[in-house]
Design a protein with these regions (language model features):
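Active-site-proximal cap/loop segments of hydrolase catalytic domains
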Residues: 5-200
Length: 200
């Protein structure tokens, strides 16, 4: 295996505000494009990289991204492992930042009964859930969730699985019965074994 990590646009405040806040309002699509472009550049530079066998994995927010990646670029990624992914940020914990990245503020000017103008504000989450992407998905996705995950409720993974089933898509899924958000002990060993097997 060749394993890389990509630093996405918006990943550090050290390069200025415009760079750091690049992803506000869309936390998913631009990092996927960054990953794909970086892999394509590396494959062009190094002939030993097989661009026809590209996989992606991630946990938590990374699980959200790996499932998004194989659904967004189904002809580029041949395998993905998504563990404990927050696939639907509409049901994510309110205290975690991901739910706020895609908040859309709408300002409307209205007149009251005396003709005085006032502004009203409404807010909505605009990051689409991964379920909306399954129509593009072709093959190669393996999902994991901890049955006792207190950080990213298993409902995230179950909603994605339900959408995949309804769309008649082929995928794999494991629910680790004794796992919370992190996988430890025998559950971690099982997860790692199945992930390596999936990518081999």
């Amino acid at each position: 295996f060749i394993v890389i990590t990509v630093g996405h646009r918006g990943g550090t405040p050290m390069r200025g505000k415009a760079y750091h806040t690049y992803g506000y309002g869309n936390q998913r699509d631009y990092p996927l494009a960054d990953d794909k472009y970086a892999i394509e550049q590396l494959a062009q530079r190094y002939s030993f990289i097989d661009i026809k066998r590209v996989g992606i994995y991630g946990h938590s927010g990374g699980g959200f991204m790996s499932a998004s990646a194989i659904c967004t670029y189904p002809d580029f990624y041949s395998a993905a492992v998504s563990s404990a992914g927050n696939h639907d940020n509409r049901i994510y914990n309110k205290g975690w930042v991901e739910i706020h990245f895609g908040v859309d503020e709408r300002i409307k000017t209205v007149k009251d009964s005396l003709g005085v103008e006032h502004k009203t504000y409404t807010y909505s989450v605009r990051t689409r859930p991964n379920q909306d992407l399954v129509k593009n998905y072709k093959h190669g996705l393996l999902l994991f969730t901890g049955a006792m995950d207190q950080t990213v409720n298993p409902a995230h993974t179950l909603r994605l699985a339900s959408a995949l089933i309804k769309a008649k898509k082929d995928f794999g899924m494991y629910v680790l019965p004794e796992s919370t958000h992190g996988f430890f002990g025998k559950s971690e060993e099982f997860f790692e074994h199945e992930m390596w097997r999936h990518f081999s």
